[in-house]
Amino acid sequence: MDVQEPPNFSTGLVAELHAPLRSAGVPDPEPYAAFIAASGEPALELGCGQGDPLLALRARGLDVEGLDASADRLARLRLRAEADGVEVVVHHSTIEAMELRRRYQSIFLAGPTFNLLPDDDTAWHALDRIRAHLEPGGAALVPLFIPERTPRSTFGVARTHITADGTEMRVTAVSETRDVAQRLQVTVLRYELIGSDGGVDRVERPWVLHWHTQDGFRSLAEEAGLTVSTVLRPDGRPAEPDDTTFAFRLTPDPAWDRPRTSRPTGGGAMMAAAMFGLEQAIFGERPKVQVVAEAEADGLDRGDIELDLDDPARSRITIQEEE
């Protein structure tokens, strides 16, 4: 199955309608507060979205930062934080490309956001970045699930929310494909905003879910230099092999020395970082953006990619050979 996913699912209208239409409710901050208490501060929430549970954890005085790939969702988070009088530090990046100056005792995802990474290569790069941002002795919490098919009876049936001024918000499952061999399910969702004047804004996005078996994810984590300490059910009990919802607690392997040949991508990581930078430039966040990423191909060390949309002729890609 070939998937052409937009740069980020949660942009524009989707970001606007996500919170009112979400079916899972607001994440309970308690499990994540307990994880931070056990693993230590500072902490980092990956895929923090519009601020749940990040802002609740910050309101408790915990040293927690956030990271998300959607600038639109982060903008909404900042507005909420300002309204609530909560100071918060957030970073705009994908997980697999993050290069932060700080290291953390605790890194976590509040829900199975990791399933949104579309393939094993991207997941490996994300785990590699998680390991690189953990302090020695720190821990990461990665919830995962194996999705079921969307019931046929729900296709074409909208989930709705009506605001006080009569505006109607809708999300509808339009179609779905599932590839068990690739562990990939793609559901096309239609988001609609219907104003009280009858005007309609509409967008369709592919919701890509890539799932992992427990054994497969364990191997992937170990390839990225992480050790599995526990695999738990949502209720905190040890996961059984046939469970479809589980969370991995990972710690950095102190003896791990990353081989140059692990997960070779022929520069794919660098290109992913470049495309992320290009997205930001196109949407006007930075007229000129420089992205530095690691190239995994043999014989390559680091590369500089500089994109200048004001003068494309000045854009450049420089690859440095290993010393």
What kind of feature is each model-predicted range?
Residues 52-97:
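Class I SAM-dependent methyltransferase SAM/SAH-binding core
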Residues 1-41, 52:
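Conserved class I S-adenosyl-L-methionine
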Residues 47-49:
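Class I SAM-dependent methyltransferase "Motif I" SAM/SAH-binding loop
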Residues 208-252:
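C-terminal lobe and adjacent flexible extensions of AdoMet/dcAdoMet transferase-like proteins
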Residues 253-276, 280-323:
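Intrinsic, low-complexity terminal and presequence regions
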Residues 141-215:
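SAM-dependent methyltransferase
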Residues 124-136:
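A short glycine-rich, Lys/Arg-flanked "PGG" loop and its adjoining helix->strand segment in the class I
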Residues 99-106:
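A short acidic, Gly/Pro-enriched loop at the edge of an enzyme's catalytic core
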